[in-house]
Amino acid sequence: MSKMEPYVRPSRLLRPDGSPDNNDRVEIGPTQLAFNEWRELGLTAPNLEAMRHYRLDRIVQQLQAQDLAGILLFDPLNIRYATDTTNMQVWITHNHARACFVSADGYMVLWDFHNCDHLSAHLPLVKEVRSGASFFYFETGDKTAEHAAHFAQEIDELLQSHAGSNRRLAIDKIEIAGLWSIEALGIEVSDGQRVMEHARVIKSLDEINAMRCSIAATEAAMHLMRDASQPGVTENDIWA
C-alpha cells in the first residue's frame, strides 16, 4: 500500500484489473507479481471498476424491488461490498465507527473514521465521505445518545433529499442508541441483511474472476507454508 496525494492527476495507463497504473495512491489490491502469476495460470483479473458498478446496481435493484428508500450499512463486509473500501476491519467489526448509506437512486455516502478520507479518494461511486458514525460507549461514553441523535438527523436529511415521502429504511446492524434515534424520527426500519444477501446471490463475471484469482493466490500460499513446515521450525519462521 502506497500513499496517494488526492490532487494528483490520475494515470491514463491501467493495470490488468482496470486500476490506474500509478503507485502514488492508496488502494488495496494485487501487485504486478500477482498479475503475472495469474496470467501464467491462465486466469483473468477482474475489472474492479466494472465490479463496483455491478455491486451498486445489485443493491439498488433490491431497494427498488422492495420499495425501500435506502439502506444503512454498518457490517464491514457489507460496506466493502457496497463501496469497495476497507479500514481496520477487525476493530470495526466490534466498534461500529464506519457506515454507508445507499439510496434507491444509487447515491452513496460513506462515514469513515476521522482523517481517513484518503482511503476512498479513488472511488467515484462514493459521492460523499463524512465522519461521525460512532455512537458506541467505548467511543462516545455518556454522550452516546447525543451522537446517535445527530447521526439519525443526517440519515433523515438524506432520506428527504433522495426518497421524498418514502420513510422505509433497511439497516443491517446498528448500535441500539442509533436504532432508537432513527425510529424516533418516524423512519420505518426493515432488515438490511436480507437486502444484502439477495444482492450477492447473482455473481458477475468479474466477481467470479476475482474469486478464481483469490483462490489461486491462497492455494499458492498454502503450498508454500506446507513446504516450509518442517520439524523444529517455528511458526514465525514459516510465516516469514
Placement of each model-derived feature along the sequence:
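A composition/biophysics-driven feature that prefers long, compositionally simple stretches
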Residues: 1-220
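Signal-transducing coiled-coil linker helices
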Residues: 48-52, 230-240
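Active-site pocket-lining segments that scaffold enzyme catalytic pockets across diverse folds
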Residues: 215-225, 235-238
